Amino acid sequence: MIERAGSHRLRALRSTVLSTLACAALLWADGALAQSPEDILMYRGPDREQKLIEGAKREGQVVIYAALIQNQAMRPIADGFGKKYPFVKLTTWRADSEDIVQKAAAEVRAHNVVADVVEGTGAGEEAVEANIAQPYYTPAVAGFAPAYRNPTGLWAPTRLSYYGTAYNTKLVAPDKVPKSYEELLDPQWKGRMAWRIGSATGTPLFLTNLRIAWGEEKARAYFDKLKDQKIVNFGAGSARTLVDRVIAGEYAIALNIFAHHPLISKAKGAPVNAQVMDPVATTAATMSVVKGLHHPHAAMLLADYILSKEGQGILARAEYFPVDPDVAPLPALAPIVPKIAGVPENFVGPDKLIKYTDSSEDIYQKLFR
């Protein structure tokens, strides 16, 4: 029997199509035809968590670069995440925010991305500035105050920081504690106050906070008076080190420090306390997802977990301030939370921090150097 060439070609084409469809079905079932990372990060469907879990099982790991204290916060986060998602290995690397973003950016430029997620004070906006962040959606931030959230989804807040003064209780009498920025101009504090230089959340944030809250004219008039107080420019260590110097009596008052640090030391018997002033400068540590990440499903599970009530509770117990309004801070630290202290708050978001830091540094150099 002689088979016509056209019939043969038709059967061959049908066989090819069926084989292709069968392979496609197998590949889809195996996850090889999964959504793009961008689609995964922005997925909002009702089956979102299940899709993330299925994808994370295939990925098997996730990497975060974070500024969280390792034993105090990151390890409990890793333990809790591991119990909830035992099929995902979490790898962490700790450094300060600037180093974290620099390392992640270098990886992106080299097309050798290791980090899936970066976290730290200002890290989100720095990642945006470095063009290494990409948008993501997480339902965990729905209950967060709108002021703390990024409308583009390029970062999400993980924890808050409140700034105030630390003062030595042996050197500053209770009735002499400065309770306003104007009271810092009292001549008795001339040469007895210090602030931290070399950090965006040190001297520049002090100046930025008042520039935003008061306006440039009023703030500059105040700075012109403040310069006569001969504030000591402290550059020999971290904000925590500066508080320790206050405890030691080297300085009577430290300006614009993390207000919970002196409270932690006070609880241990140190002669130090904190005072917040109107307006209280507030910043947020933020979390971004890195362009070119290899584990998008697991990265979203990790982001969801850190921002969940469980994750926020872990951070609260680690002496951080949660962003979730339903998660309370530790009672010993609560007095410096603006809404509890009854003092107005000025949230200096990552975008504002970056926008104002250079010009505030210029003011510092001209007036206080």
Question: Positions of the model-derived regions?
Answer:
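Immediate post-signal peptide segment of exported/extracytoplasmic ligand-binding proteins
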Residues: A34-V63, G82-K83, D186-K190
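Extracytoplasmic ligand-binding site segments that recognize negatively charged/polar headgroups
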Residues: V63-A78, L90-V108, N112-E250
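Extracellular/periplasmic bilobal clamshell ligand-binding domains
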Residues: P329-R369
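Periplasmic-binding protein-like
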Residues: P146-A147, L160-Y163, G191-S199, F223-Q229, N233-A236, I306-P329, ...
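A bilobed periplasmic-binding-protein/Venus flytrap-type ligand-binding module shared by bacterial periplasmic
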Residues: G164-L171, L207-I212, T283-A298, I314-L315
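A ligand-binding cleft/hinge motif common to bilobed small-molecule-binding domains
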Residues: G124-A127, A252-P271
